[in-house]
């Protein structure tokens, strides 16, 4: 993290609606990498030491404020409301009160630029030291829609002209404004007070500051890659930005010792942590505050949300883990589901089509097949057979199930909570238990088996005889003992 050596504040412009998103939600609330768009420039400004950072909000102001406060807890954030959308200069001026008596450099950036790097912001801030204003520029093969950079005969930026106000010659220019500026606060407020709206859109353009700064003491242009500075205006651009962020993240992780088998099929939110020597198979999705320990292996199609995995955990394909904790060397899946509150112990096994919810499995405990464990505590070394169900809900309340260390639960057992199976106890397959079982005991909760030898043959013979009788023709009246004429 590179901090500015001089006082630095930042203003993030996040007031617009974003009509091209075709959404009821404000543009800057749309997410990439599990974060709202406005989070990215705000976070990058914080990374280079900006304090405070003022977010100018407008459309859905309360929701934008809440999203930034929730995703940047404890950060020196302030908020300013632009009640009327009168242009970018008006938006920046809306932040003046929030900055109070602050004197120093002010970095201005757009809230829809998730690809900006902290290093780029630092370059723009550093460039201002030799001028009244610094701004980022980029060269585009198709500059349509962007403000063009007009330079003087000496090659110094003289002004920015917006697309709708440009002449044909100016529209032919390929150097455009990237919407990232740095200026001294004193100059900024004085210049903004002089900006007018005599332009094609009748708006107060922030870009008018460039001409004012050129006259006051000079402007420095800082070239930046188009990929980095381009804003997000619609869903296609949102998706493209997301892929760029994922490629960056995959590259960063691989350089730190993580194996990602196919970086093009890797999906990871901002803030996810992955330890060295972890292996990520294709189509894994890592969300929220997930933490992956060293040496873990995540199988294809696994989805982890706010999960914490210790070192050496194996997650087989298509396992879903949400708000669960998994200890070292545990084995999960394939096709298992760990719901919130699950706590899986060291070397425990949770196998295919097993679902856990608020369940704790001790060291080496196993539930390998077709099982539901809800509100359950499973002791170390216990084995839960296929098809076992903990019936934790009575229609009104949840109840706990406790299975002691070394206990053995036979297949297709139903444990009706609240219930406790003692350490080392056995439950016979197919049992339905409603009472606790003492340690070391065997519990059978099923009907007694009855075997009837020869029953199948007798049943088949009866069926055949019945079928033959039903198929025989009915007797005619003449054949009846009462059917003839009396003599």
From Swiss-Prot:
Gene Ontology biological process terms from the UniProt entry: cell morphogenesis; cell wall organization; lipid A biosynthetic process; peptidoglycan biosynthetic process; regulation of cell shape; UDP-N-acetylglucosamine biosynthetic process
Q: Which residues bind acetyl-CoA?
A: 386, 392-393, 411, 429, 446
Q: Where is this region: Pyrophosphorylase?
A: 1-235
Pathway involvement of the protein, from the record? Nucleotide-sugar biosynthesis; UDP-N-acetyl-alpha-D-glucosamine biosynthesis; N-acetyl-alpha-D-glucosamine 1-phosphate from alpha-D-glucosamine 6-phosphate (route II): step 2/2; Nucleotide-sugar biosynthesis; UDP-N-acetyl-alpha-D-glucosamine biosynthesis; UDP-N-acetyl-alpha-D-glucosamine from N-acetyl-alpha-D-glucosamine 1-phosphate: step 1/1; Bacterial outer membrane biogenesis; LPS lipid A biosynthesis
A GO term for molecular function: UDP-N-acetylglucosamine diphosphorylase activity
Q: Where is this region: N-acetyltransferase?
A: 257-487
Where do Low complexity bias regions lie?
468-481
Q: Give me the reactions it catalyses.
A: alpha-D-glucosamine 1-phosphate + acetyl-CoA = N-acetyl-alpha-D-glucosamine 1-phosphate + CoA + H(+); N-acetyl-alpha-D-glucosamine 1-phosphate + UTP + H(+) = UDP-N-acetyl-alpha-D-glucosamine + diphosphate
EC number(s) given by UniProt: 2.7.7.23, 2.3.1.157
Q: Which parts of this chain are annotated as the region Disordered?
A: 453-487
Q: Which residues bind UDP-N-acetyl-alpha-D-glucosamine?
A: 13-16, 27, 82, 87-88, 110-112, 147, 162, 177, 233, 339, 357, 372, 383
Its subcellular locations are:
Cytoplasm
Q: Which CDD domains match?
A: GT2_GlmU_N_bac, LbH_GlmU_C
Binding residues annotated for Mg(2+), in chain numbering: 112, 233
What highest taxon heads this organism's lineage?
Bacteria
Pfam families recorded = Hexapep, NTP_transf_3
Report the cofactors: Mg(2+)
- Write out the ranges of the annotated region (Linker): 236-256
- Cite the cofactor comment: Binds 1 Mg(2+) ion per subunit.
HAMAP family on file: GlmU
What quaternary structure, including any partners, is listed in this protein's UniProt entry?
A: Homotrimer.
PANTHER family associated with the record: BIFUNCTIONAL PROTEIN GLMU, NUCLEOTIDYL TRANSFERASE
Q: What is this protein called?
A: Bifunctional protein GlmU
**Species name for this entry?**
Anaeromyxobacter sp. (strain Fw109-5)
């Amino acid at each position: 993290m590179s901090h500015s050596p001089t006082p630095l504040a930042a203003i993030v412009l996040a007031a617009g609606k974003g009509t091209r998103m075709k959404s009821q939600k404000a543009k800057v609330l749309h997410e990439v990498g599990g974060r709202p768009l406005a989070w990215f420039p705000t976070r990058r400004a914080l990374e280079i030491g900006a304090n405070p950072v003022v977010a100018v909000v407008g459309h859905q102001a309360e929701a934008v404020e809440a999203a930034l406060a929730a995703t940047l807890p404890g950060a020196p954030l302030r908020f300013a409301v632009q009640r009327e959308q009168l242009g970018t200069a008006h938006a920046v001026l809306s932040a003046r009160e929030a900055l109070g008596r602050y004197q120093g450099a002010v970095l201005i950036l757009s809230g829809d630029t998730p690809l900006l790097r902290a290093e780029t912001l630092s370059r723009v801030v550093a460039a201002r030291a030799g001028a009244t204003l610094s701004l980022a520029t980029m060269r585009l093969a198709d500059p349509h829609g962007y403000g063009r950079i007009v330079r003087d005969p000496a090659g110094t930026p003289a002004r920015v002209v917006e697309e709708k106000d440009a002449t044909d010659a100016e529209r032919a220019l390929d150097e455009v404004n990237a919407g990232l500026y740095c200026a001294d606060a004193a100059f900024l407020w004085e210049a903004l007070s002089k900006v007018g709206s005599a332009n094609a859109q009748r708006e107060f353009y922030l870009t008018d500051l460039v001409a004012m700064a050129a006259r006051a003491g000079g402007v420095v242009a800082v070239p930046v890659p188009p990929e980095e500075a381009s804003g997000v205006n619609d869903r296609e651009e949102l998706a493209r930005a997301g892929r760029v962020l994922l490629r960056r993240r995959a590259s960063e992780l691989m350089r730190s010792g993580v194996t990602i088998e196919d970086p093009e099929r890797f999906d990871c939110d901002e803030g996810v942590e992955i330890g060295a020597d972890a292996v990520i198979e294709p189509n894994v999705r890592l969300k929220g505050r997930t933490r992956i320990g060293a040496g873990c292996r995540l199988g294809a199609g696994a989805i982890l949300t706010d999960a914490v995995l210790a070192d050496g955990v194996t997650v087989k394909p298509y396992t879903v883990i949400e708000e669960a904790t998994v200890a070292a060397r545990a084995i999960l899946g394939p096709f298992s589901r760990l719901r919130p509150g699950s706590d899986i112990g060291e070397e425990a096994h949770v196998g295919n089509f097993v679902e856990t919810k608020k369940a704790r499995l001790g060291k080496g405990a196993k539930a390998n097949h077709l099982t539901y464990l809800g509100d359950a505590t499973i002791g170390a070394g216990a084995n839960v057979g296929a098809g076992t169900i903990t019936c934790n809900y009575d229609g009104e309340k949840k109840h706990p199930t406790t299975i002691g260390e070394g206990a053995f639960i036979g297949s297709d057992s139903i444990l009706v909570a609240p219930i406790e199976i003692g350490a080392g106890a056995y439950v016979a397959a197919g049992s339905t238990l409603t009472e606790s079982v003492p340690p070391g005991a065997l519990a059978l909760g099923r009907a007694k088996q009855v075997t009837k030898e020869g029953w199948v043959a007798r049943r088949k013979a009866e069926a055949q005889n019945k079928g033959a009788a039903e198929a025989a023709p009915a007797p005619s009246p003449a054949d009846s003992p009462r059917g003839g004429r009396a003599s």
